[in-house]
């Protein structure tokens, strides 16, 4: 009971402080966000008092639960549910802003205009959908590969709920116009501080689990996860160094200025793509692809070479975002050179993942989850070829500031991050909820095709739009003046913007189908359907044996 009172007291104190901060706030946005914190603290107080499990709390939140033989999968289950929820929210906002670009009348001032919804979309899919995927999958993978329960179970739960609070504060801030205007780092100083606390707790849980492992070897997926956690911490702290105007206000000013500010921002921005959207998703690939294919990783040595090559090269490539700017030319060239070198280790990882399917290629036809993983690896290979190509100065002179970059980013995000995340969710749900199988594998197949066709429409439309923009912007007449005004280029892109909205809608529809599939699986239902076609397979020839048509068999008789 004493522990319950202590926790209730902490929640009550947090609520009082939040209410006082809201009362004395220097601006309305800060007051609104402090009231959100107060509501969260009130909910925590209510849970502590009304639903307290005195026995569990008395045992100590940092001690092992009674049965150490089972893995601690509660935070993983919550993370999977959060992943599914935020995927739909983030993609729904993405479809809305795609429609706003095609039909500007859909902008609603001030809260639902493109300027406020665009960072909500990017943070929603990167940090809410992607971040929850990574936290949940890392908790699952580190326990299985270390044969140990999560260290600090209470802290693991704090990480989950603390991260959801970060998402809510960041998202509500964007709608209120509270932003640092730094790509992928829009939240203001107090939200950044909260995320730092949550991230340190995440690091403690992950490293603590590694330290208590029963398996002597640390599997390579955990190397990728740990580098993700450490590097994102470094990037987040340095890039978000700022001086608040007031400790009771939302506004702050960066510690950097001028070209140093730009370089610091894109050192962070590029490496957010590298160490948030690439490295930890490769950790997922190195665990889930072999598990689903029931094959060992093709080359463990190649995975180690892949890891160290990426770690050394990726951190230097940020200046390629600042080609043809005030950044010194030597720094631009350095970023270009390291970006080109990244092509080989990136493809090494793709090849390692694809070659893991040696002897199991028949499953690509019969297992839509494997098919999603293969498509994810294909898009990873394509995006990591296109990125170095776009960093070459002569190519970048055409693509810079155009929608080609948008197409490149979304081919990677939708194809690589989205597909591998969906596959991981489909892998995890039956195992976490102890179900025989998913509600419907055929729905997974439908999801795969809707997502794939949606990506093709989206990326192709943006590639065409980007090249159109680049060529129209640089077209000069005989008199030496530009032929096209900016408005002319925008009008020319209208058909491509409609195609982008259509592709995004298809991709969103697939995610909604996933939500239904996951929910019905959790409820324990199974759709009455024939299993996916299993062709008779000739292993030596690595191809299916084509059945003889019935009329030929009858003629032979």
Indicate where each model-derived feature is located:
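Acidic, Ser/Thr-rich low-complexity segments on the non-lumenal side of membrane proteins
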Residues: 547-557
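Hydrophobic cores of alpha-helical transmembrane segments in multi-pass integral membrane proteins
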Residues: 3-57, 77-178, 190-210, 222-247, ...
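Active-site-proximal inter-transmembrane loops
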Residues: 255-264, 399, 404-406
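Conserved, charged catalytic cores of large soluble enzymes
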Residues: 62-63, 235-256, 261
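Membrane-interfacial, low-structure loops and terminal tails that flank and connect transmembrane helices
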Residues: 54-76, 360-363, 435-438, 528-541, ...
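Membrane-proximal first intracellular loop
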Residues: 67-74, 116, 185, 214-220, ...
